[in-house]
Amino acid sequence: MGSEGWSRRRFVGALTGAGAAAVLPACNDAPPPTDPTAAEAGTSTPEASTSAPARSRAPSGPRPLYVGTYTSVEGGGTGIGLATYDATSGRITKTGTLTGVGDPSYLAVHPNGRTLYAVNEREAGAVTAVRLSDRKVLGSRSTGGGGPCHLSVHPGGRWLLSANYTSGSVAVHPIDASGALGERADLVTHSSPAPGPGQEGPHAHQFVTSPDGGHVLAVDLGTDTVYTYRLDERTGRLGEVAQAHTRPGAGPRHLTFHPGGRYAYLANEVDNTVAVCAYDPDGGRLTVGDAQSTGTGSGTNYPAQILVTSNGAYAYLANRGHNSLTRYAVEADGARLRLLDTVPVSGDFPRQIAFSPDGTLLFAANQKSGTVSVFHVDEDSGELRLAGEPFASPVAVCALPL
């Protein structure tokens, strides 16, 4: 099944039960595909903001929803789940499955809304492009590493960024005018610093672009480090400019930026904390603040992903072990998080969360229960209200609402 590191990441939930392991916030300018209610696609041969989009009026009619899964585990899916959701009620309706994409555990959409990208989380990792208008798989490219677990599209739309968990590396692929991927432009392995306590090597977990677009940041759970790079937008090559270190053993997993662009919030998987980080857009330097509580007690929790509302007033953290969402008030223009409460997620092992494009709904992909929970988000209070019964989807590990 691959290396020890990949097995731990993929099956971390086995410590508390059976099962298989953003934002992904939807791009707010992404139109729906031509036929969002298309039925099951035929078998084919083988994003990028980290905060909520600005609120707008809820669109009318069904909106597309894509659900990532594992295809190579017992009880897993057979491809990318296709569904629609009602932007007012939050109700999800299944429309089919896009087959021909193996282990699509994380998804992102191109800024123009025409192409969907998926990782193929396997030992020989790859990324796959899918044209949304007719659900055609445009092809896959090697990530140069094992267990790719995250990807995002650079805001310019010309480069795909991906993170290889097992090999602790990040990759860059060119995107052509059709949305298809070219040969890998760069691959960087996190060889320094040395792995943190209890880690056997680097484990890249996320690769995203800063709000100003000037830098790309890679979060590595294995080295307790966030790496900042400059991306050469002509060649796709990466140049490291800074490293930010958490406390030893924190195990950083996912980062999200405040809309103001001067602060970011880091979810630490291993020590069950979050941290406020100051960010200097000129030099790309991130400074990690003190660890803060997730509000889940002392038990094993595995925080997964953190999101911030478009008005910068509230943040939400997915807690896989506690099966909850922690709600924080964001204060001092982004410099401070104040814990408010935790809300049951109505599912088991919420691995990923995402806002709808208008920010009125929050989707949680619950890996072990095989469900997607939807919550109404109160703009003024930040309170979450469950929108009906969770939607059944096998080994749901990523929900991408457009």
Please provide the spans of the model-predicted regions.
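N-terminal export signals
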Residues: 2-4, 10-29
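N-terminal low-complexity, Pro/Thr-rich disordered segments
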Residues: 23-61
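Short loop/turn segments immediately following the C-termini of beta-strands
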Residues: 70-72, 121-122, 165, 175, ...
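Beta-rich, blade/repeat-based domains predominating
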Residues: 76, 101-111, 144-155, 192-211, ...
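Short loop/turn segments immediately following beta-strands, especially the blade-tip
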Residues: 84-89, 132-133, 174-181, 230-236, ...
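A short beta-strand motif characteristic of beta-propeller blades
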Residues: 93-98, 137-141, 192-197, 239-245, ...
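Asp-box/WD-like beta-propeller blade repeats and closely related beta-sheet repeat scaffolds
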Residues: 138-205
